[in-house]
Protein backbone atom coordinates (compact mmCIF):
# COMPACT_ATOMS: atom_id res chain seq x y z
CA UNK A 1 0.00 0.00 0.00
CA UNK A 2 1.35 3.43 -0.91
CA UNK A 3 2.40 5.91 1.78
CA UNK A 4 -0.48 8.05 0.54
CA UNK A 5 -2.81 5.94 2.66
CA UNK A 6 -0.49 5.21 5.56
CA UNK A 7 -0.78 8.36 7.63
CA UNK A 8 -4.38 9.21 8.50
CA UNK A 9 -7.92 7.99 8.92
CA UNK A 10 -9.00 10.83 6.61
CA UNK A 11 -7.14 9.22 3.72
CA UNK A 12 -8.87 5.91 4.43
CA UNK A 13 -12.20 7.73 4.59
CA UNK A 14 -11.54 9.20 1.14
CA UNK A 15 -10.67 5.77 -0.25
CA UNK A 16 -13.91 4.40 1.20
CA UNK A 17 -15.89 7.11 -0.62
CA UNK A 18 -14.21 6.24 -3.92
CA UNK A 19 -14.96 2.55 -3.37
CA UNK A 20 -18.57 3.22 -2.42
CA UNK A 21 -19.16 5.11 -5.65
CA UNK A 22 -17.26 2.59 -7.76
CA UNK A 23 -14.43 4.87 -8.92
CA UNK A 24 -11.94 2.06 -9.50
CA UNK A 25 -9.35 4.30 -11.17
CA UNK A 26 -8.89 6.38 -8.00
CA UNK A 27 -8.92 3.23 -5.86
CA UNK A 28 -5.96 1.87 -7.85
CA UNK A 29 -4.21 5.23 -7.83
CA UNK A 30 -4.53 5.73 -4.07
CA UNK A 31 -3.78 2.12 -3.13
CA UNK A 32 -0.94 1.29 -5.52
CA UNK A 33 0.24 4.71 -6.70
CA UNK A 34 -0.67 3.85 -10.28
CA UNK A 35 -3.68 2.92 -12.41
CA UNK A 36 -4.29 1.33 -15.79
CA UNK A 37 -5.82 4.34 -17.53
CA UNK A 38 -7.43 7.68 -16.62
CA UNK A 39 -11.12 7.36 -15.93
CA UNK A 40 -13.67 9.96 -14.81
CA UNK A 41 -17.02 8.76 -13.44
CA UNK A 42 -20.31 9.99 -14.95
CA UNK A 43 -21.19 13.62 -14.12
CA UNK A 44 -23.78 12.93 -11.40
CA UNK A 45 -21.55 10.34 -9.74
CA UNK A 46 -18.62 12.78 -9.75
CA UNK A 47 -20.82 15.44 -8.16
CA UNK A 48 -21.89 13.03 -5.41
CA UNK A 49 -18.28 11.95 -4.81
CA UNK A 50 -17.12 15.54 -4.41
CA UNK A 51 -20.04 16.29 -2.08
CA UNK A 52 -19.21 13.28 0.11
CA UNK A 53 -15.51 14.17 0.17
CA UNK A 54 -16.28 17.45 1.90
CA UNK A 55 -15.44 21.18 1.78
CA UNK A 56 -12.13 21.19 -0.11
CA UNK A 57 -13.46 18.97 -2.88
CA UNK A 58 -16.76 20.84 -3.08
CA UNK A 59 -14.77 24.03 -3.67
CA UNK A 60 -12.69 22.21 -6.28
CA UNK A 61 -15.83 21.03 -8.05
CA UNK A 62 -17.33 24.52 -7.99
CA UNK A 63 -14.14 25.88 -9.51
CA UNK A 64 -14.10 23.16 -12.18
CA UNK A 65 -17.69 24.09 -13.07
CA UNK A 66 -16.28 27.35 -14.45
CA UNK A 67 -13.64 25.58 -16.60
CA UNK A 68 -15.17 24.35 -19.88
CA UNK A 69 -11.62 24.11 -21.22
CA UNK A 70 -11.07 21.12 -18.90
CA UNK A 71 -14.47 19.42 -18.64
CA UNK A 72 -17.21 18.78 -21.25
CA UNK A 73 -20.63 20.50 -20.98
CA UNK A 74 -22.44 17.66 -19.19
CA UNK A 75 -19.86 17.79 -16.37
CA UNK A 76 -20.02 21.59 -16.21
CA UNK A 77 -23.81 21.38 -15.84
CA UNK A 78 -23.63 18.77 -13.07
CA UNK A 79 -20.94 20.58 -11.08
CA UNK A 80 -22.67 23.96 -11.43
CA UNK A 81 -25.32 22.69 -9.01
CA UNK A 82 -22.71 21.42 -6.56
CA UNK A 83 -23.33 22.44 -2.97
CA UNK A 84 -21.71 21.15 0.19
CA UNK A 85 -24.06 18.86 2.07
CA UNK A 86 -22.72 19.99 5.44
CA UNK A 87 -25.00 20.71 8.40
CA UNK A 88 -24.72 24.07 10.11
CA UNK A 89 -22.60 24.29 13.25
CA UNK A 90 -24.92 24.15 16.31
CA UNK A 91 -25.89 27.57 17.75
CA UNK A 92 -24.16 27.03 21.10
CA UNK A 93 -20.88 26.11 19.42
CA UNK A 94 -21.03 29.00 16.97
CA UNK A 95 -21.88 31.50 19.72
CA UNK A 96 -18.79 30.43 21.63
CA UNK A 97 -16.69 30.69 18.46
CA UNK A 98 -18.02 34.19 17.68
CA UNK A 99 -17.34 35.36 21.22
CA UNK A 100 -13.80 34.03 20.93
CA UNK A 101 -13.01 35.73 17.62
CA UNK A 102 -15.12 38.90 17.59
CA UNK A 103 -13.14 41.99 18.72
CA UNK A 104 -15.89 42.90 21.20
CA UNK A 105 -18.57 40.95 23.08
CA UNK A 106 -21.60 40.48 20.78
CA UNK A 107 -23.97 42.28 23.13
CA UNK A 108 -21.84 45.43 22.86
CA UNK A 109 -22.08 45.68 19.05
CA UNK A 110 -25.31 43.88 18.12
CA UNK A 111 -28.86 44.77 19.00
CA UNK A 112 -29.58 41.17 18.10
CA UNK A 113 -27.84 38.25 16.40
CA UNK A 114 -29.24 34.96 15.16
CA UNK A 115 -26.90 32.12 16.09
CA UNK A 116 -28.88 29.79 13.83
CA UNK A 117 -27.18 29.91 10.42
CA UNK A 118 -29.07 31.52 7.54
CA UNK A 119 -26.85 29.61 5.12
CA UNK A 120 -24.10 27.03 5.58
CA UNK A 121 -21.29 26.54 3.09
CA UNK A 122 -18.20 24.41 2.75
CA UNK A 123 -15.83 26.87 4.46
CA UNK A 124 -18.14 29.11 6.47
CA UNK A 125 -21.72 29.80 7.45
CA UNK A 126 -23.68 33.05 7.50
CA UNK A 127 -25.67 34.62 10.32
CA UNK A 128 -27.91 37.68 10.34
CA UNK A 129 -27.42 40.39 12.95
CA UNK A 130 -28.65 43.91 13.68
CA UNK A 131 -26.11 46.52 14.74
CA UNK A 132 -26.79 48.96 17.55
CA UNK A 133 -27.48 51.65 14.92
CA UNK A 134 -30.18 49.47 13.31
CA UNK A 135 -28.28 48.33 10.21
CA UNK A 136 -28.66 44.69 9.20
CA UNK A 137 -25.39 42.85 8.65
CA UNK A 138 -24.31 39.44 7.45
CA UNK A 139 -21.80 37.74 9.72
CA UNK A 140 -19.77 35.15 7.85
CA UNK A 141 -18.22 32.76 10.37
CA UNK A 142 -15.52 30.25 9.51
CA UNK A 143 -16.42 26.68 10.43
CA UNK A 144 -14.51 25.73 13.62
CA UNK A 145 -11.63 23.41 12.77
CA UNK A 146 -11.92 23.89 9.01
CA UNK A 147 -8.32 25.10 8.75
CA UNK A 148 -7.01 21.70 9.90
CA UNK A 149 -9.34 19.86 7.49
CA UNK A 150 -8.25 22.07 4.60
CA UNK A 151 -4.56 21.58 5.38
CA UNK A 152 -4.95 17.80 5.43
CA UNK A 153 -7.06 17.60 2.28
CA UNK A 154 -4.87 20.04 0.36
CA UNK A 155 -1.80 17.91 1.11
CA UNK A 156 -3.61 14.82 -0.18
CA UNK A 157 -4.91 16.67 -3.24
CA UNK A 158 -1.37 17.69 -4.17
CA UNK A 159 -0.23 14.08 -3.84
CA UNK A 160 -3.07 12.88 -6.06
CA UNK A 161 -2.09 15.53 -8.63
CA UNK A 162 1.48 14.21 -8.60
CA UNK A 163 0.22 10.70 -9.31
CA UNK A 164 -2.09 11.88 -12.11
CA UNK A 165 0.66 14.06 -13.62
CA UNK A 166 2.18 11.03 -15.31
CA UNK A 167 -0.94 10.44 -17.42
CA UNK A 168 -1.71 12.13 -20.74
CA UNK A 169 -4.52 14.07 -19.04
CA UNK A 170 -2.18 15.20 -16.27
CA UNK A 171 0.44 16.37 -18.74
CA UNK A 172 -2.07 18.16 -20.98
CA UNK A 173 -3.51 20.25 -18.15
CA UNK A 174 -0.47 20.42 -15.84
CA UNK A 175 -2.50 19.14 -12.91
CA UNK A 176 0.34 19.71 -10.44
CA UNK A 177 0.33 23.44 -11.19
CA UNK A 178 -3.47 23.51 -11.07
CA UNK A 179 -3.48 21.77 -7.68
CA UNK A 180 -0.87 24.18 -6.32
CA UNK A 181 -2.78 27.21 -7.59
CA UNK A 182 -6.03 25.90 -6.13
CA UNK A 183 -4.35 25.09 -2.81
CA UNK A 184 -2.88 28.57 -2.46
CA UNK A 185 -6.20 30.20 -3.29
CA UNK A 186 -8.06 27.99 -0.82
CA UNK A 187 -5.57 28.69 1.97
CA UNK A 188 -6.01 32.42 1.32
CA UNK A 189 -9.79 31.98 1.67
CA UNK A 190 -9.25 30.98 5.29
CA UNK A 191 -8.10 34.52 6.13
CA UNK A 192 -11.21 36.68 6.06
CA UNK A 193 -9.15 39.88 6.35
CA UNK A 194 -7.85 39.08 2.86
CA UNK A 195 -11.38 38.50 1.59
CA UNK A 196 -12.36 41.84 3.11
CA UNK A 197 -9.56 43.58 1.19
CA UNK A 198 -10.44 41.81 -2.06
CA UNK A 199 -14.11 42.71 -1.63
CA UNK A 200 -13.26 46.37 -1.04
CA UNK A 201 -11.06 46.44 -4.15
CA UNK A 202 -13.78 44.91 -6.33
CA UNK A 203 -16.37 47.24 -4.81
CA UNK A 204 -14.18 50.25 -5.63
CA UNK A 205 -13.29 49.07 -9.14
CA UNK A 206 -16.88 48.27 -10.09
CA UNK A 207 -18.46 51.35 -8.53
CA UNK A 208 -17.54 53.27 -11.69
CA UNK A 209 -17.80 51.99 -15.22
CA UNK A 210 -18.39 52.98 -18.82
CA UNK A 211 -19.29 49.38 -19.64
CA UNK A 212 -22.40 49.00 -17.46
CA UNK A 213 -24.62 50.88 -15.03
CA UNK A 214 -22.88 50.59 -11.61
CA UNK A 215 -26.22 51.23 -9.92
CA UNK A 216 -27.37 47.79 -11.10
CA UNK A 217 -24.48 45.95 -9.40
CA UNK A 218 -23.78 45.49 -5.70
CA UNK A 219 -20.58 44.37 -4.02
CA UNK A 220 -21.29 44.32 -0.27
CA UNK A 221 -19.80 46.93 2.03
CA UNK A 222 -17.39 45.51 4.59
CA UNK A 223 -17.59 46.45 8.27
CA UNK A 224 -13.92 46.45 9.22
CA UNK A 225 -14.20 46.92 13.02
CA UNK A 226 -16.02 43.57 13.25
CA UNK A 227 -13.86 41.66 10.75
CA UNK A 228 -11.10 39.25 11.79
CA UNK A 229 -9.35 36.28 10.19
CA UNK A 230 -12.25 34.05 11.23
CA UNK A 231 -15.21 36.46 11.01
CA UNK A 232 -16.29 38.70 8.14
CA UNK A 233 -18.97 41.35 8.69
CA UNK A 234 -20.68 42.96 5.70
CA UNK A 235 -23.93 44.63 4.73
CA UNK A 236 -26.98 42.40 4.54
CA UNK A 237 -28.40 41.86 1.05
CA UNK A 238 -31.82 40.31 0.44
CA UNK A 239 -31.94 38.01 -2.55
CA UNK A 240 -31.45 34.52 -3.96
CA UNK A 241 -28.77 32.74 -6.02
CA UNK A 242 -29.29 33.82 -9.59
CA UNK A 243 -30.34 30.40 -10.93
CA UNK A 244 -32.97 30.04 -8.19
CA UNK A 245 -34.30 33.60 -8.32
CA UNK A 246 -37.74 34.48 -9.73
CA UNK A 247 -36.84 36.85 -12.56
CA UNK A 248 -40.25 38.22 -13.54
CA UNK A 249 -39.46 41.21 -15.74
CA UNK A 250 -41.08 43.62 -13.30
CA UNK A 251 -38.93 46.54 -14.49
CA UNK A 252 -39.40 45.50 -18.13
CA UNK A 253 -43.17 45.60 -18.45
CA UNK A 254 -43.42 41.96 -17.46
CA UNK A 255 -41.08 40.88 -20.27
CA UNK A 256 -39.09 38.11 -18.56
CA UNK A 257 -36.94 37.53 -21.64
CA UNK A 258 -35.91 41.18 -21.77
CA UNK A 259 -34.85 41.18 -18.12
CA UNK A 260 -32.93 37.93 -18.49
CA UNK A 261 -31.10 39.41 -21.47
CA UNK A 262 -30.31 42.57 -19.48
CA UNK A 263 -29.02 40.56 -16.51
CA UNK A 264 -26.86 38.41 -18.79
CA UNK A 265 -25.45 41.51 -20.49
CA UNK A 266 -24.71 43.13 -17.13
CA UNK A 267 -22.84 40.11 -15.76
CA UNK A 268 -20.94 39.70 -19.02
CA UNK A 269 -19.79 43.34 -18.93
CA UNK A 270 -18.98 43.25 -15.22
CA UNK A 271 -16.54 40.41 -15.76
CA UNK A 272 -15.14 41.88 -18.95
CA UNK A 273 -14.24 45.01 -17.02
CA UNK A 274 -12.50 42.91 -14.39
CA UNK A 275 -10.51 40.98 -17.00
CA UNK A 276 -9.72 43.64 -19.57
CA UNK A 277 -9.69 46.92 -17.63
CA UNK A 278 -8.95 46.29 -13.97
CA UNK A 279 -6.81 43.16 -14.25
CA UNK A 280 -8.26 42.13 -10.87
CA UNK A 281 -11.11 39.65 -10.97
CA UNK A 282 -13.41 37.42 -8.93
CA UNK A 283 -11.99 33.95 -9.58
CA UNK A 284 -14.87 31.87 -8.21
CA UNK A 285 -17.90 33.07 -10.20
CA UNK A 286 -20.08 29.97 -9.91
CA UNK A 287 -23.85 30.68 -9.85
CA UNK A 288 -24.06 30.51 -6.05
CA UNK A 289 -21.88 33.60 -5.79
CA UNK A 290 -24.15 35.72 -8.00
CA UNK A 291 -27.36 36.86 -6.31
CA UNK A 292 -30.49 38.40 -7.78
CA UNK A 293 -31.67 40.87 -5.15
CA UNK A 294 -35.26 41.72 -4.26
CA UNK A 295 -34.79 45.16 -5.83
CA UNK A 296 -33.70 43.50 -9.14
CA UNK A 297 -30.02 44.38 -8.79
CA UNK A 298 -27.23 41.81 -9.11
CA UNK A 299 -24.85 41.15 -6.22
CA UNK A 300 -21.35 39.70 -6.50
CA UNK A 301 -20.56 37.75 -3.32
CA UNK A 302 -17.85 35.60 -1.73
CA UNK A 303 -14.83 37.45 -3.07
CA UNK A 304 -12.23 35.36 -1.24
CA UNK A 305 -10.73 33.86 -4.40
CA UNK A 306 -9.34 36.41 -6.84
CA UNK A 307 -7.03 36.48 -9.85
CA UNK A 308 -4.81 39.09 -11.45
CA UNK A 309 -3.88 39.77 -15.08
CA UNK A 310 -0.91 41.87 -16.12
CA UNK A 311 -1.12 44.37 -18.98
CA UNK A 312 0.58 42.00 -21.43
CA UNK A 313 -1.91 39.20 -20.77
CA UNK A 314 -4.80 41.65 -21.02
CA UNK A 315 -3.58 42.84 -24.43
CA UNK A 316 -3.37 39.22 -25.63
CA UNK A 317 -6.97 38.65 -24.49
CA UNK A 318 -8.11 41.77 -26.33
CA UNK A 319 -6.38 40.62 -29.52
CA UNK A 320 -7.96 37.18 -29.15
CA UNK A 321 -11.43 38.66 -28.75
CA UNK A 322 -10.96 40.97 -31.73
CA UNK A 323 -9.82 38.01 -33.82
CA UNK A 324 -12.91 36.03 -32.81
CA UNK A 325 -15.28 38.92 -33.52
CA UNK A 326 -13.68 39.64 -36.91
CA UNK A 327 -13.30 35.91 -37.77
CA UNK A 328 -9.62 36.61 -38.39
CA UNK A 329 -7.65 33.44 -37.58
CA UNK A 330 -4.39 35.11 -38.66
CA UNK A 331 -4.64 38.06 -36.29
Where are these regions (language model features)?
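Short, conserved catalytic or interaction motifs in soluble domains
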Residues: 287, 303, 311
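Conserved beta3 strand of the Hanks-type protein kinase catalytic N-lobe
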Residues: 129-130, 285
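N-terminal accessory/targeting segments that precede structured cores
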Residues: 1-125, 151-177, 183
Amino acid sequence: MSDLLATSSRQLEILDIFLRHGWDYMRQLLTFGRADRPEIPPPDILRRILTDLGPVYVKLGQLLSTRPDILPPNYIHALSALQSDVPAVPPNTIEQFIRQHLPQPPEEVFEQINYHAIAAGSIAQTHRAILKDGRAVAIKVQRPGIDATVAQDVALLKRIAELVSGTDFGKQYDVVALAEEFSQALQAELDFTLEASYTETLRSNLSQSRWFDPQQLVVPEIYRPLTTKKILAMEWLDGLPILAAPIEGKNYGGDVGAERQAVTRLIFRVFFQQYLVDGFFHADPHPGNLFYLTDSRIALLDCGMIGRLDAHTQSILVELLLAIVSLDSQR
